[in-house]
Swiss-Prot record:
This is Acetyl-coenzyme A carboxylase carboxyl transferase subunit alpha. It comes from Chlamydia abortus (strain DSM 27085 / S26/3). Pathway: Lipid metabolism; malonyl-CoA biosynthesis; malonyl-CoA from acetyl-CoA: step 1/1. GO terms for molecular function: acetyl-CoA carboxylase activity; ATP binding; carboxyl- or carbamoyltransferase activity. The lineage of its organism: Bacteria, Pseudomonadati, Chlamydiota, Chlamydiia, Chlamydiales. Its EC number is 2.1.3.15. It catalyses: N(6)-carboxybiotinyl-L-lysyl-[protein] + acetyl-CoA = N(6)-biotinyl-L-lysyl-[protein] + malonyl-CoA.
Amino acid sequence: MELLPHEKQVVEYEKTIAEFKEKNKKNSLLSSSEIQKLERRLDKLKEKIYADLTPWERVQICRHPSRPRSVNYIEGMCEEFVELCGDRTFRDDPAVVGGLAKIQGQRFMLIGQEKGCDTSSRMHRNFGMLCPEGFRKALRLAKMAEKFGLSIVFLVDTPGAFPGLTAEERGQGWAIANNLFQLARLKTPIIVLVIGEGCSGGALGMAIGDVIAMLEHSYYSVISPEGCASILWKDPKKNSEAAAMLKMHGEDLKQFAIVDVVIKEPVGGAHHNPAAVYRDVRDFILREWLRLKDLSIEDLLEQRYQKFRTIGLYETSSESSPEA
């Protein structure tokens, strides 16, 4: 597993404990109580390190090569999954994986953005950067869900929509805008979960829903930290400062009413205990589905409209208001 800079001290401590345990099999260097004491110190060290992570360190966790991706969540949560492909206009976009899913006996239309896990699959998936056909594919499946009375689950994980010339020629901006328009008035419950990177219009094109959740170390932002640093300071190396300024993580976005729920991750990130994350995400989906399914279509659409209508509102106190 690839090591992040802030993980080195933890890994060295873990190796030391493992060496003591191995030597103890031949010579009793430490008692079991002393080993347990070292393990408790390790737990405290982990808690301290991961409680004091900077925004940039959390971005690194979010981008960890071993972090679970959409296909992993599908395998970990679903009893059944039937993939549906193509946009019925141009071609299939491998950066989107979607289809009919069964979770705890309940049927959903599950649509996820997929980056890939190694060099060949990342190239095949275009590193999770959607082309116009990817957005059209997602919308086609969403409308199919509406037609058959299925709730929709979107899994967001993208560094952004594909910025290439071919994507622009095929109407990238229009495809994203049309998704925003169509998803806002879709007559079925929509649950959105940001599981990794949620960057710019590439994320927003699949993030219109009745409830929006994020994993603890995922991020949701108008731009990547590197892109922000390049624009503001002409220096992509100032990504740490940009990550802090963008307020891109769950606790900040929840205060701004951009996201509704932040799902805790295991200590160190989702890649350290994927099974626990699959369970928590599954439970969240089922809990929100139970809440949304009994709403009338009128109430569902009105709440969705008001949710996005109020994003960006702010209040000023009368004391700070200029006198007439």
